[in-house]
């Protein structure tokens, strides 16, 4: 136990010790000067019986923990679901009783996850996100920079750190905070519902909630390919829980994939291993847990389809006449009439004004080539959506696509 130095006339500062007597010379170093806080504090850390915290992150040489359960002076455990506590600088397991942040006390929300980026703490509840600025070395100068409602998370594994910022999956999309603002990575890229984008069953509402209506999306970041991997369910809590989306930060595009994960299996959270590989453990219910890593390499995929958004050319109310589409591509396989179109948001590629472009993919022997696609006659429309059926064999790449059209200035949709 600690005993403070005391002063006695004729002896000076000393500590009584039964074995060795008194210290004659005063000690310049005291408990307070060494540790930065008084020895009289009753609470120094979270580690008593049944004391816990449910979220944590290390930033600016401090540990931040949230959603804590602490023992009160009465000996009873008291829960602070909306409290964030922080350690002393460089003392990552020392939490003083007055080192806490109550950003929104009394809003009945509990913190689910913490992350840090660009001198900010991102504190997630189920229904909102707090962005707290901790750039100042003085604690009293920390402040709540932004509160964003309806962008919370349901699990810690729905949040991940990337070199581009903090990414997370909320109820209505996948978001990124880049140190300046929050943006929706899925906006106008993944359909909200079947009717909102294409005639495909791949849409956010059915994928996010799954057959069991459980919201447990797991998110990981692969630093090698600079990609996000968004898995439907690590707990097999839905039919086809292996369904996944992959986001490429370099192209800003999403890819739907059912071959990365195995349905009816159970997965650990993602980690980044010693070799910078995104890894996780998988259990199929019968054998031992097997650890696997994500490898961003090309593999065979069947029945691939590509859809553009409904393109209005910047003039949504005007009638346009579309003459041709020019595609720069290379392919190891041939494909007959792979491009189709739908008009005016109707999502029909065979009727209601939709149809097939004339023009075939050729085997270019891994060299870039240009394909000109034409409709049977110029298409008059407000907007156009293009669908592409990938070759059934081989590897293909599309570099760019341009549409030749003319706005009919004196004709507007009625």
Regions found by a protein language model. Give the residues of each.
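Non-cytosolic beta-sandwich-type ligand-binding/adhesion modules
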Residues: 5-10, 15-22, 27-29, 302-414
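Viral virion structural and adsorption modules
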Residues: 63, 129, 174, 268, ...
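Repetitive beta-architecture junctions, highlighting loop-to-beta-strand starts
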Residues: 2-3, 61, 82, 127, ...
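Surface-exposed loop/turn elements that mediate protein-protein interactions on large endomembrane-trafficking
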Residues: 5-16, 29-33, 75-101, 133-141, ...
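Beta-sheet-dominated scaffold domains
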Residues: 70, 107-297
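Disordered, low-complexity "stalk" and linker segments at domain junctions of extracellular
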Residues: 1-76, 91-100, 188, 195-198, ...
